[in-house]
């Protein structure tokens, strides 16, 4: 990735993190809230690959953790994995497919919700499973899917297309 591309991507992640904390997280619709930063990180992972996706996920999650004064590292870890998963999906299946952002955002929203719940539970925080995994996750999934394609198009326009990566066809284990 070039330096100007990395700077543009960093600005997009920072703006998305600020919007997430200041505006978007306060808009609760049907019990769930849109996760704009997750959609942006997934889009960057699809466009740039697994390593940049993980880096931008960590950076965006760290900004959110610092601004909300939540348990430091939970959002960072969840978004790091989300960016990595999206990048691997883009590298292995072809990021040019029209439905790739929808599939990635849908699957990663569910995985991030479950993983976030498990992290909070393992840290001993009071989390109600029904609320975290049903009441909040289902509307969040619907909202994320609703805005996945427009946000992905906006991110692609802002940061440009990533380098052409040929899909991985096989993996060799070296001993």
What are these regions (language model features)?
Residues 1-175:
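Terminal, non-globular segments
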């Amino acid at each position: 990735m070039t330096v100007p591309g990395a700077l543009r991507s960093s600005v997009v992640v920072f703006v998305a993190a600020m919007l997430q904390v200041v505006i978007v997280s306060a808009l609760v619709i049907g019990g769930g809230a849109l996760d704009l930063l997750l959609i942006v990180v997934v889009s960057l992972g699809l466009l740039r690959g697994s390593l940049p996706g993980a880096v931008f996920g960590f950076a965006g999650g760290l900004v959110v953790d610092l601004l909300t004064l939540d348990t430091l590292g939970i959002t960072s870890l969840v978004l790091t994995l989300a960016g990595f998963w999206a990048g691997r999906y883009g590298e292995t299946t072809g990021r040019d497919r029209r439905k790739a952002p929808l599939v990635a955002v849908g699957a990663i929203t569910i995985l991030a919700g479950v993983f976030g719940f498990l992290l909070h539970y393992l840290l001993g925080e009071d989390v109600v499973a029904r609320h975290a995994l049903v009441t909040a996750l289902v509307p969040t999934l619907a909202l994320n899917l609703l805005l996945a394609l427009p946000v992905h198009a906006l991110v692609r326009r802002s940061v440009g297309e990533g380098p052409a990566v040929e899909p991985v066809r096989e993996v060799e284990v070296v001993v």
